[in-house]
Regions:
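N-terminal binding-site loop/beta-alpha segment at the start of enzyme catalytic domains
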Residues: 1-33
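Glycine-centered flexible beta-alpha turn that most often forms the glycine-rich phosphate-binding loop
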Residues: 5, 69, 105
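Short amphipathic alpha-helices and their capping/turn segments at secondary-structure boundaries
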Residues: 15-25, 56-64, 137-145
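Beta/alpha (TIM)-barrel catalytic core signal, keyed to glycine-rich beta->alpha loops juxtaposed to Asp/Glu
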Residues: 21, 76-210
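A short, structured active-site edge motif that brings together acidic residues
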Residues: 28-41, 74-75
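Active-site mouth loops of central-metabolism enzymes
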Residues: 38-54, 80-82, 161-167
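CE4/NodB-like, metal-dependent polysaccharide N-deacetylase domain
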Residues: 52-75, 95-99
Length: 210
C-alpha cells in the first residue's frame, strides 16, 4: 500500500497543503521532506549552510503541523561529494536527528559516489533506478549489504519506459525495483487518480507475487 509522502520546500505549497490533510492521521504516514533547494521566482537556489538547514527543517515542521519528520533528504544540485564533504548540511541534520526533530537523514543525489558516501555517513539515499537507467545500482547493493534505506525516484522512467509490444511497463518497472533487496520504497508521482489506483494495484500484485 501507500504510507509514504514525499514533499519538499521546493515543491510549491506542497507542505502547506499536506499539514491540514494530515490532521488526525499523522501516525499513519511516513513523511519525507528535503533541505538545500529553494524554488523562487521560477528558479532554483541552493543553500547547504548549517543555518539554512536548521531554518528549513523548522519551517517544514510548522508547515506540516508535526513535531517530527521521519526522513529529511538533502536536495543535491548535482555536486554530491562537494555537498557532503565541504558543507555543514549533513552535520546539521545529524544534530537535528539527535534532537528528535527528524528521525533519519540522507541524500537525494545524482551520482554513485555521492550515494555511497551518503549511506556511509547517513541513513538513506534517494536514487534514480528504472528500466532505462541503472547506473546507480551499486548504491542499492551497498544499502542491502549494510542495512541502509533506499528510495527510488523516477521509478517509472517518468512514464517513458520503453519495452516490447505487449509488455506492461508499470509491472516490469515494479518487478525490477522490488526485486532488489536494497529498495525500501519508490516515489510514484501522478496527477491522474485512475493512474494512481492502477499503479497501486500493480505494485500490490508484484509485492504479493500475484
Amino acid at each position: 500500500g501507500i504510507n509514504l509522502i514525499d514533499t519538499a520546500p521546493a515543491y510549491g505549497v506542497s507542505e502547506e497543503r499536506l499539514g491540514p490533510l494530515l490532521a488526525g492521521q499523522r501516525e499513519d504516514w511516513v513523511i519525507v521532506s528535503k533541505v538545500g533547494e529553494e524554488f523562487e521566482n521560477g528558479q532554483s537556489r541552493f543553500d547547504f549552510s548549517a543555518a539554512h538547514t536548521r531554518f528549513s527543517v523548522e519551517r517544514s515542521l510548522k508547515r506540516l503541523r508535526t513535531d517530527r519528520i521521519e526522513l529529511v533528504l538533502v536536495h543535491s544540485d548535482g555536486n554530491d561529494l562537494d555537498i557532503l564533504q565541504h558543507t555543514e548540511v549533513y552535520q546539521t541534520l545529524a544534530q537535528l536527528k539527535r534532537e528528535g526533530k527528524i528521525l533519519a537523514f540522507g541524500l537525494s543525489g545524482k551520482t554513485v559516489d555521492g550515494g555511497l558516501l551518503a549511506l556511509q555517513q547517513g541513513d538513506c539515499a534517494m536514487v534514480t533506478y528504472n528500466l532505462n537507467e541503472q547506473a546507480e545500482r551499486p548504491v542499492l547493493d551497498y544499502a542491502a549489504a549494510h542495512g541502509k534505506g533506499i528510495l527510488i525516484k523516477k521509478a517509472l522512467a517518468s512514464g517513458h519506459a520503453c519495452l516490447k509490444p505487449g509488455d506492461d511497463p508499470v509491472r516490469r518497472s515494479f518487478e525490477l525495483l522490488f526485486g532488489h533487496p536494497g529498495v525500501s520504497g519508490a516515489i510514484i508521482g501522478t496527477i491522474n487518480p485512475q493512474h494512481l489506483t492502477s499503479n497501486v494495484a500493480t505494485a500490490a500484485a508484484v509485492l504479493t507475487g500475484d
